[in-house]
Amino acid sequence: MAASQVLGEKINILSGETVKAGDRDPLGNDCPEQDRLPQRSWRQKCASYVLALRPWSFSASLTPVALGSALAYRSHGVLDPRLLVGCAVAVLAVHGAGNLVNTYYDFSKGIDHKKSDDRTLVDRILEPQDVVRFGVFLYTLGCVCAACLYYLSPLKLEHLALIYFGGLSGSFLYTGGIGFKYVALGDLIILITFGPLAVMFAYAIQVGSLAIFPLVYAIPLALSTEAILHSNNTRDMESDREAGIVTLAILIGPTFSYILYNTLLFLPYLVFSILATHCTISLALPLLTIPMAFSLERQFRSQAFNKLPQRTAKLNLLLGLFYVFGIILAPAGSLPKI
């Protein structure tokens, strides 16, 4: 996007002459109104697609899958690696597609700008049609994985479809269609989709039935995942307000956003402390990440929001992994089925 060039004019580098839009160059080709994107290698193109997926956020979908699978293993003694991999790919595909939908609609609504964290379309790293095609591919990949899971898993079709397409709908409607993000309901969608729903999906795929207790065990992880989104929305509070959209961070203001972030950050540790005291000491493993949480609290308090969502996602990943290890290491019968 060469802002210094005059729109409708182009320099002929062969002759040094100025060529008007619509004229032909010495080779007989039409001169487009805007410069074309420079040709890039396939490696650069692949790197651009990976960047558009925001892979740093994938802890929000991988840790719930790991937790649901660990609960299935600890409660029923079953863990099919094929189902684990298929479930992880399906959830990752839906998550990645949801990120692309968010990128597309934020750009089309004029929310993303040069100072935004996601400048995939603003900087023309990819074109809008590239993002749309990639999103369709990922949703299709997710559906193919769901179909494979149906043939491999003992879970009933109606239960699998209900959970999977519920998550798929949530990932799209976050910014597409209704656009829950723009009416302060995005936090609720993320809290449900990348918390209880993803954990239940991974658990049910393994054991072939639904249960209540995986939803309860998903709460600490869901709160940590919501902290990622809330830190992102707090950082973008001013630009979102200028764009005319409403998020939870805008509604409650900076002070209560700080209080909410701390609640989302530290409440899981209270839950882990209670579980470690009354159930098994292995569930104290996530407490090892408390120093990271205090570091994030200081960064939020000082309003140094740069890279805060990414650092919160890193905490979410480590906390989730320690939580999963704690579940796996728990003695048989020590975990209550609520």
Curated annotation (Swiss-Prot):
Transmembrane segments: 83-103, 134-154, 160-180, 188-208, 209-229, 245-267, 277-297, 315-335
Pathway noted in the entry: Quinol/quinone metabolism; menaquinone biosynthesis; Cofactor biosynthesis; ubiquinone biosynthesis
Keyword Electron transport: no
Tissue: Ubiquitously expressed.
This protein's GO CC annotations: cytoplasm; endoplasmic reticulum; endoplasmic reticulum membrane; Golgi membrane; membrane; mitochondrial membrane; nucleus
Bilayer disposition of the protein: Multi-pass membrane protein
Catalytic activity: menadiol + (2E,6E,10E)-geranylgeranyl diphosphate = menaquinol-4 + diphosphate; all-trans-decaprenyl diphosphate + 4-hydroxybenzoate = 4-hydroxy-3-(all-trans-decaprenyl)benzoate + diphosphate
Enzyme Commission identifier(s): 2.5.1.-, 2.5.1.39
One of the Pfam families matching this protein, by short name: UbiA
Keywords: Acetylation, Corneal dystrophy, Cytoplasm, Disease variant, Endoplasmic reticulum, Golgi apparatus, Membrane, Menaquinone biosynthesis, Mitochondrion, Nucleus, Prenyltransferase, Transferase, Transmembrane, Transmembrane helix, Ubiquinone biosynthesis
Result, substituting D112G: In SCCD; does not affect coenzyme Q10 synthesis
Keyword Transferase tagged: yes
Matches recorded under InterPro entries: UbiA_prenyltransferase, UbiA_sf, UBIAD1
Class of enzymatic activity (EC top level): transferase
GO molecular function terms listed in the Swiss-Prot or TrEMBL record: antioxidant activity; prenyltransferase activity
GO biological process, one term: vitamin K metabolic process
Location in or out of the cell: Endoplasmic reticulum membrane; Golgi apparatus membrane; Mitochondrion membrane; Cytoplasm
Residues with PTM N-acetylalanine: A2
Gene3D superfamilies the record matches: UbiA prenyltransferase
Disease: Corneal dystrophy, Schnyder type: A form of stromal corneal dystrophy characterized by corneal clouding, resulting from abnormal deposition of cholesterol and phospholipids, and decreased visual acuity. Typically, ring-shaped yellow-white opacities composed of innumerable fine needle-shaped crystals form in Bowman layer and the adjacent anterior stroma of the central cornea. The crystals usually remain in the anterior third of the cornea. The corneal epithelium and endothelium as well as Descemet membrane are spared.
Miscellaneous remark of the record: Strongly down-regulated in transitional cell carcinoma of the bladder and in prostate carcinoma (at protein level).
Its job: Prenyltransferase that mediates the formation of menaquinone-4 (MK-4) and coenzyme Q10. MK-4 is a vitamin K2 isoform present at high concentrations in the brain, kidney and pancreas, and is required for endothelial cell development. Mediates the conversion of phylloquinone (PK) into MK-4, probably by cleaving the side chain of phylloquinone (PK) to release 2-methyl-1,4-naphthoquinone (menadione; K3) and then prenylating it with geranylgeranyl pyrophosphate (GGPP) to form MK-4.
Stated family: Belongs to the UbiA prenyltransferase family.
Subunit structure: Interacts with HMGCR and SOAT1.
Protein name: UbiA prenyltransferase domain-containing protein 1
Gene name in the database record: UBIAD1
